[in-house]
Amino acid sequence: MTSSSPARPPVAAASTPSDAKVALGWLHTAKFLTTAPELKHLPRLDVPEIAFVGRSNAGKSTCINTLTQQHRLAFASKTPGRTQSINLFSLGKQGVTDAVLADLPGYGYAAVPKEAKYRWQQVMGNYLQTRDNLKAVVLLCDPRLGLTELDEILLDVLRPRVEEGLKFLVLLTKSDKLNKTEAAKALSIVRLQAGGGDVKLFSSLKRKGVEEVAQHLWDWAHPPEKPAKKPKAEPAAEAATGDEG
């Protein structure tokens, strides 16, 4: 698959993971980068990309806006299922991009024509399977519904890449609508559905889980550098043989 390759933004050196305050300050640098109706229109990037996915009305745009502390960075259409583009947002201080957030269209809204649904299933599947710089996926889910059939299909698509090291997190949004007993039950059920994957409660209204998720995003985008391999020692020179004349 080929795609256009616009000029790449400058890339920052890897940073050391720090506390949630640093992570939130970094997320606040988010700026709109580009939008693409199809995968082939996305720019090729060398920085880590973190994708947000989920059903329509799962609170995806609100979650992104809360994490970045910006009111309208991610646009939430008044008509669920209307947004049908992948939106990228650059992250990085002093104009140096060191990661990108990807806001994928919500899925599962009944009023969307079947043709559009099928096209977006293909686009999302191709994106999740082939996007080279994709390092992590955040799946947003309404805990009152649990993971739906479409969510579980998405998990199946992701599973091979997760086994290869792709980071994955399920966020139970709107958790402020649950009491403690309901929240604990929702966590248990979704953890089983997600095959033991990482699942957390999140509430934009109560700011529950915001700092913890921000720290996850920071750590995924700034993995510790692997220690450089020591060069192999040169074989000792063999002693010269024979008499010198």
Swiss-Prot record:
Top-level taxon of the source organism: Bacteria
Residues where Mg(2+) binds: S61, T83
InterPro entries assigned to the protein according to its UniProt record, in alphabetical order: G_ENGB_dom, GTP-bd, GTP-bd_ribosome_bio_YsxC, P-loop_NTPase
Bias type Low complexity, positions: 236-245
Annotated EngB-type G domain residues: 46-223
Cofactor(s) demanded: Mg(2+)
GO molecular function annotations of the record: GTP binding; metal ion binding
Biased composition (Basic and acidic residues): 222-235
Region (Disordered): 219-245
Record GO biological process: division septum assembly
Pfam families for this protein: MMR_HSR1 (PF01926)
Any one cellular-component term (Gene Ontology): cytosol
Gene3D superfamilies registered for this protein in UniProt: P-loop containing nucleotide triphosphate hydrolases (3.40.50.300)
Chain positions recorded as GTP binding sites: 54-61, 81-85, 103-106, 173-176, 202-204
Keywords: Cell cycle, Cell division, GTP-binding, Magnesium, Metal-binding, Nucleotide-binding, Septation
Described function: Necessary for normal cell division and for the maintenance of normal septation.
Family in the record: Belongs to the TRAFAC class TrmE-Era-EngA-EngB-Septin-like GTPase superfamily. EngB GTPase family.
Stated name of the protein: Probable GTP-binding protein EngB
Organism taxonomic ancestry: Bacteria, Pseudomonadati, Pseudomonadota, Betaproteobacteria, Burkholderiales
